[in-house]
């Protein structure tokens, strides 16, 4: 069953899709609040009553982890509500599309794999241009990226030519790319016709007379124990300790104050990452977390820093996991499974940014950010790893440890609502 705020989004979105063929919209919900489950219920309703159990669904994501999570959610919903035996088609990695009959199928595809397949096989492109009911894009804030944008427009245009325009549904906790006015932000809003649906806080407050009224989505869900509340515990390191020049400090400040995706100079990042005093303080805190059995996801400054911290943990007989972009998928899954196992001694997962999306572990007790973060998207994704509350299998409170560089960003409420003013609400 859906919770009231999920049901309300489902009701509003289905009503919107029924008003016009080929309607497009984006669902904006916090990480851990059930975006995927809500989308699956929407698919079930539309497939049964609007698509007459015909045609097929296309679910797109950028990573294998996201696709596997989506399949698990679909199976759970379909087991209880499905009107017919839908066929699951996997299209990523070693999985290929073989059956030409797509009627009654839901295709879970990586964007890279689907695009490569459609380029080399004209017949596949013709097949997918017939009977496509709805395209769902998980983590859709990435949709403006050139290749993804081209793929979506190609699918929408081809189906338009064939006479039936599919609906387009985006899912994200961060409905923007950079600072709101960037070209990619504009492309994102245009792709979804500037339509964004989220949690109706005013309506939900009326459903909860026993609670004091919440001012925003995050506060509402925290009061309901759906999201966890953060206990902030910063590590304060002075500029003198980092031994940065005035020019380097100014570079960081300008990057942190920028509305866009301005990055801190890589040489400065390396200098920060190699600072012995800084790393000593970080490791002392990690030792303490591990000794207390606190499940921690650690975001390093760069790849070299991640390897250094992981090696130091290992040398001190701490069972940590290291996950980088180059990590083999089988080894990555093994480490993630070990981390998720509460009986395992693996309490710390070290990465740079790989685990910002496609990683779902309700048992995270601590998010540790050691790098200067200049992107509101990246920052939101990082803190989102630990935001799942007790009603969603997580914790009532989550520790958030940041180095002082990241404190220029506001709290989780500010981060979630950052892009609202750029959309037609």
Identify the function of each model-found stretch.
Residues 20-44:
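Walker A/P-loop
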Residues 111-113, 125-170, 175-177:
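SF2 helicase catalytic motif II
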Residues 132, 347-351, 355-373, 378-385, ...:
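A short beta-strand element within the Helicase C-terminal
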Residues 1-28:
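Conserved pre-motif I regulatory segment
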Residues 219-228, 377-380, 388-425:
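A conserved SF2-helicase RecA2
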Residues 96-99, 297, 307-308, 318-355:
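Conserved helicase ATPase core of P-loop NTP-dependent helicases/translocases
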Residues 33-38, 53-76, 301-304:
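Conserved Walker A/P-loop ATP-binding site and its immediately adjacent core
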Residues 3, 181-294:
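Interdomain helical connector at the RecA1-RecA2 junction of SF1/SF2 helicase-like NTPases
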């Amino acid at each position: 069953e859906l919770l009231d705020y999920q049901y309300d989004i489902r009701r509003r979105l289905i009503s919107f899709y029924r008003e016009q063929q080929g309607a497009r919209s984006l669902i904006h919900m916090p990480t851990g609040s059930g975006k995927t489950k809500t989308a699956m219920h929407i698919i079930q309703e539309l497939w049964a009553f609007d698509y007459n159990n015909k045609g097929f669904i296309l679910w797109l994501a950028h990573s294998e982890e996201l696709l596997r999570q989506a399949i698990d959610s679909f199976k759970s919903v379909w087991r209880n509500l499905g009107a017919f035996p839908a066929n699951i088609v996997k299209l990523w990695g070693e999985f290929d599309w073989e059956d030409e009959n797509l009627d009654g199928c839901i295709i879970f595809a990586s964007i890279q794999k689907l695009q490569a397949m459609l380029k080399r096989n004209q017949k596949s492109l013709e097949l997918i241009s017939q009977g496509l009911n709805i395209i769902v894009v998980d983590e859709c804030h990435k949709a403006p990226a050139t290749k993804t944008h081209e793929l979506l427009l190609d699918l929408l245009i081809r189906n338009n030519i064939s006479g039936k325009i599919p609906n387009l549904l985006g899912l994200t906790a961060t409905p923007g790319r950079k600072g709101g006015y960037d070209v990619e932000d504009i492309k994102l809003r245009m792709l979804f016709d500037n339509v964004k649906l989220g949690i109706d806080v005013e309506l939900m407050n009326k459903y909860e007379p026993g609670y004091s009224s919440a001012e925003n989505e995050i506060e509402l869900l925290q009061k309901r124990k759906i999201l966890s509340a953060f206990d902030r515990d910063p590590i304060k390191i002075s500029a003198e300790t980092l031994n940065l020049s005035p020019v380097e400090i100014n570079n960081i400040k300008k990057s942190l104050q920028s509305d866009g995706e301005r990055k801190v100079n890589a040489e400065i990042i390396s200098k920060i990452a190699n600072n012995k005093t800084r790393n000593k303080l970080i490791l002392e805190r990690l030792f303490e977390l591990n000794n207390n059995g606190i499940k921690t996801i650690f975001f390093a400054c760069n790849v070299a820093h991640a390897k250094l911290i992981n090696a130091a943990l290992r040398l001190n007989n701490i069972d940590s996991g290291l996950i980088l972009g180059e990590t083999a998928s089988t080894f990555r899954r093994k480490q993630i499974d070990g981390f998720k196992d509460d009986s395992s001694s693996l309490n710390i997962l070290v990465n740079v940014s790989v685990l910002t999306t496609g990683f779902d572990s309700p048992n995270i007790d601590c998010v540790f950010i050691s790098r200067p973060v200049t992107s509101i998207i990246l920052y939101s994704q990082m803190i989102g790893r630990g935001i799942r509350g007790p009603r969603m299998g997580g914790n009532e409170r989550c520790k958030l440890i940041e180095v002082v560089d990241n404190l220029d960003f506001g709290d989780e409420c500010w981060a979630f609502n950052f892009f609202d003013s750029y959309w037609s609400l």
